[in-house]
From Swiss-Prot:
GO biological process: biotin biosynthetic process
Gene3D superfamilies noted in UniProt: Aspartate Aminotransferase, domain 1 (3.90.1150.10), Type I PLP-dependent aspartate aminotransferase-like (Major domain) (3.40.640.10)
Pathway recorded for this protein: Cofactor biosynthesis; biotin biosynthesis
N6-(pyridoxal phosphate)lysine, modified sites: K238
GO MF annotation: an example: pyridoxal phosphate binding
Keyword entries, A-Z: Biotin biosynthesis, Pyridoxal phosphate, Transferase
Natural source organism: Aliivibrio salmonicida (strain LFI1238) (Vibrio salmonicida (strain LFI1238))
Alphabetical list of NCBIfam families matching this protein: bioF
Protein name: 8-amino-7-oxononanoate synthase
């Protein structure tokens, strides 16, 4: 029996390698900012999710250091024991007020927040209907939950409506993302929200890549489309420059999650110093509009300079995919850019569908016009 596990592991690794899909962790020596250092060499970083440039901000670092001085290193317990402190409560209140909800519940990651909602909310006889390109955390939770799961074609409102009308399950939960992380495109939230309400279903939006970047003062995609879903998930590992997540909902749903969401109940709470730093990151997002303005300008520059380049997808976000096709060519292009001092990651199946391997270029407010020019010139030469 023990040998069966070893054989399974060996076989899986061999097949992954033969398919050219093996991934490796890279040791970053000096931070994950607009420049990074690997094996003693400096690269322009176009692979991170630090959209507003807060991850390396000295102002935010000082806020975390202040939190450490005030509250120590760790929370010491789960939230329902003694791990929930004033910085956690303050952050939840600030998020709820900012995003227009009654309640917020903190989690240690966006992955755990998404799974916690689906696992705690869905029961046998329920239905969850998800966009076909939703994040792995949502898809996995939907498959493993006791509910019936269906997928609607990407951003296809009519298909969602058809699935909901044909369903005999009740209740139904519709789940989508605000910004899709691999294509950088937006979900048609207004239409999806309308169809969901017409079919008496609940609507959940994961706005990991929109919150902080889009909408009034960075409130995200729901603000951009002027909708209020039943459940909103925001994460802190992108525009906030830190880590963690929160689920926004009404008070009763928040109480329910606090009681039944096992990822929340049985996990050590995030350090209070981190919550303190996140509150400061939130104030920076709200007040430092120049970061979003600069990001927009860099985005326009990137697309203008690559307007004739095959495979470049135009987006309203700092995520700029360049569709290559096969994995080998995508890896070769990524390696060639690294030789020129630019770090771009080749995204391959199973993360994206077969035949759509790509470079996932991401921009940050910490980049300069010169940085973008260097990248676009290099891509033009190599393509």
């Amino acid at each position: 029996m023990k040998q069966a596990f070893s054989e399974r592991i060996s076989s899986a690794l061999t097949l992954r390698k033969q398919a050219g899909l093996t991934r490796a962790r890279t040791v970053i020596e000096q931070g994950n900012q607009s420049r990074l250092s690997v094996d003693g060499k400096s690269y322009l970083n176009f692979s991170g999710n630090d959209y507003l440039g807060l991850a390396g901000s000295q102002e935010l670092t000082q806020a975390w250091q202040q939190g450490l001085s005030l509250y120590g290193s760790g929370s010491g317990a789960s939230p329902l024991v003694t791990g929930y402190s004033k910085p956690h409560a303050d952050l939840e209140s600030q998020l709820a007020e900012w995003l227009g909800f009654d309640c917020a519940v903190l989690f240690n990651s966006g992955f755990s927040a998404n799974q916690a909602v689906l696992f705690s909310l869905l029961e046998k006889g329920d239905q969850v209907v998800q966009d076909k390109l939703n994040h792995a955390s949502l898809m996995e939770a939907g498959i493993l939950s006791p509910a019936s799961m269906k997928r609607f074609k990407h951003n296809d409102v009519a298909h969602l409506d058809k699935l909901l009308k044909a369903s005999i399950c009740n209740p139904s939960l519709v789940v989508t993302e605000g910004v899709f992380s691999m294509d950088g495109d937006l979900s048609p939230l207004s239409e999806l929200s309308r169809v969901t309400k017409e079919n008496n279903a609940w609507f959940m939006v994961d706005d990991a890549h929109g919150c902080g970047v889009l909408g009034s003062h960075g409130r995200g995609c729901c603000d951009l489309y002027q909708i209020t879903p039943d459940i909103l998930v925001v994460t802190f590992g992108k525009a906030f420059g830190l880590s963690g997540a929160a689920v926004l909902c009404n008070v009763e749903c928040g109480d329910y999650l606090s009681q039944f969401a096992r990822h929340h109940v049985y996990s050590t709470a995030m350090p209070p110093a981190q919550a303190h730093a996140l509150s400061h990151a939130l104030s920076m997002i709200q007040q430092q509009e120049w970061r979003r303005k600069k990001l927009d300008e860099l985005s326009q520059q990137f697309e203008s300079e690559l307007r004739l380049c095959v495979g470049v997808i135009t987006t309203q976000t700092p995520i700029k995919p360049i569709i290559i096709g096969d994995s080998e060519t995508a890896i070769a292009l990524s390696d060639s850019l690294k030789e020129k001092g630019m770090w771009t990651t080749a995204i391959r199946p199973p993360t994206v569908p077969l035949g759509t391997a790509r470079l996932r270029v991401t921009l940050s407010a910490n980049h300069s016009e010169k940085d973008i020019k260097l990248l676009t010139q290099a891509i033009t030469e190599l393509r």
